[in-house]
Amino acid sequence: METQIRADEISRVLKEQINQYNKKIEVSETGSVLSVGDGVARIYGLENAMAGELVEFPGEVFGMVLNLEEGYVGAVLFGEDRHIKEGDVVKRTKKIVSVPVGEALLGRVVDALGNPIDGRGAINTPHSRIVETKAPGIVYRHPVEEPLQTGIKAIDALVPIGRGQRELIIGDRQTGKTTIAVDTIINQKGLNVQCFYVAIGQKQSTVALVVEKLRAAGALEYTTVIAANASDPAPLQYLAAYSGTAMAEYFRDTGRHALIVYDDLTKQAQAYRQLSLLLRRPPGREAYPGDVFYCHSRLLERASKLSADKGGGSLTALPIIETQAGDISAYIPTNVISITDGQIFLESDLFYKGVRPAISVGKSVSRVGGAAQIKAMKQVAGSLKLELAQFRSMEAFAAFASDLDKASQQQLARGRRLIEVLKQPQYSPVKVEEQIIMIFAAGNAFVDQYPETDVKRYEKEMIEFLKNKHSDIIKTISEKKAIADDTKKALLAALEEFKAIFQPSNK
């Protein structure tokens, strides 16, 4: 018995199959790998590729186009190159390298491409930004006038930092550069400043320690850590600083304040040198490529204080540079010194003497200066730098002199007590009003009569005494940000009152 198929059934089956057919034709511009090795690939056939474009290799490995040659393009890889071989197909994405930005990144640890690496799930944010953007022009900027308090007495008094400034932290390894940066981040708690810590070429254990310190201080909730570790490919170490800046710019451009720390740009320059030599770019001084200055200047120029028309936001940058045996005249240190608005120079000799933070008063400078200080700090810290500089020169002279007159001995004794006042343990920033009161007490000779070993105890007990008995003085300085005549009289009277009850250890 023959099965008869009706014509309407045939048409129905055909329609169903047509509706179910969903195969898509994907059109993409492709090229092929000519050679690959050391994290760099040469690709033939991507005639329309853009500089900085993201390209896709087999196995979901991505790269970035850096060289545009006549017959090929040079790309750096953001992943392992072990499984990529000659002849592999490379696709254009037609996208410039970008990273996610927004509030969702606060409190997270991400890699140089914005992917989370803290094991706390995906980052959900609708916003993204290109990693390399043009710095704001002159007409869109506002002079740096608003202080960014670091909580470190020696910095806030002697080399003040303003919102929108670029202040270099420079010194040999193990002199406390990272500690200053982390202290500054911790001190932004409650000040509505979003912080970004970019770790470039650091050991994973070091980055984990910084993250733990931030978490313990309650600072991680307003901080994003961007980590390109020593084990990561050189392209990620090069890119991390630009990615972090793009994330921070989101807050600056929405009228808020951000702080970014680059720890450190020496390793970024070394990663860029490695990439440039592998891409066969001509080497220059110390084998760095000719555009290594531009690599850093275009990064640091993005830190700025915007005008009120642009929302009045700010991005403050604290780049870190590591020197070799205190040589600040090397290529990368001189480059970054010339780009930034001042530097905080840390000396190994001071560090080993127990002066911490080991800030060299003579070599450290802020080109913004008093504009980034509140009036009260200007009033008390005006003569401090001069006194410390005179002490350092007198100390050097005293090392060779056998007999000193009484005035010189007094100057040396006073200088040593001022140094004690400026000493500070790590991860313990001090409120600006407390800094002002302590520097005021030292400037008015209230600590001169006590042994050096008593200065820290004097500071602690004196601040506690004022908080308990004269909290109105601290409140007035905090609110008015200046020391009026009546406040000065009240503070002097309170210090005299404390002087009567303080017990030095030698009595």
UniProtKB/Swiss-Prot annotation:
Its EC number is 7.1.2.2. One of its GO terms (cellular component) is proton-transporting ATP synthase complex. ATP binds at residues 171-178. It comes from the Bacteria. Pfam families: ATP-synt_ab (PF00006), ATP-synt_ab_C (PF00306), ATP-synt_ab_N (PF02874). Keywords: ATP synthesis, ATP-binding, Cell inner membrane, Cell membrane, CF(1), Hydrogen ion transport, Ion transport, Membrane, Nucleotide-binding, Translocase, Transport. It is a peripheral membrane protein. The keyword Cell inner membrane applies. It is found in: Cell inner membrane. It catalyses: ATP + H2O + 4 H(+)(in) = ADP + phosphate + 5 H(+)(out). Coiled coil: none annotated. InterPro entries: ATP_synth_asu-like_sf, ATP_synth_asu_C, ATP_synth_asu_C_sf, ATP_synth_F1_a_nt-bd_dom, ATP_synth_F1_asu, ATPase_F1/V1/A1_a/bsu_N, ATPase_F1/V1/A1_a/bsu_N_sf, ATPase_F1/V1/A1_a/bsu_nucl-bd. It is an enzyme of class 7 (translocase). The record marks 364 as: Required for activity. One of its GO terms (molecular function) is proton-transporting ATP synthase activity, rotational mechanism. Belongs to the ATPase alpha/beta chains family. F-type ATPases have 2 components, CF(1) - the catalytic core - and CF(0) - the membrane proton channel. CF(1) has five subunits: alpha(3), beta(3), gamma(1), delta(1), epsilon(1). CF(0) has three main subunits: a(1), b(2) and c(9-12). The alpha and beta chains form an alternating ring which encloses part of the gamma chain. CF(1) is attached to CF(0) by a central stalk formed by the gamma and epsilon chains, while a peripheral stalk is formed by the delta and b chains. Produces ATP from ADP in the presence of a proton gradient across the membrane. The alpha chain is a regulatory subunit. This is ATP synthase subunit alpha. It comes from Bdellovibrio bacteriovorus (strain ATCC 15356 / DSM 50701 / NCIMB 9529 / HD100). The gene is atpA.
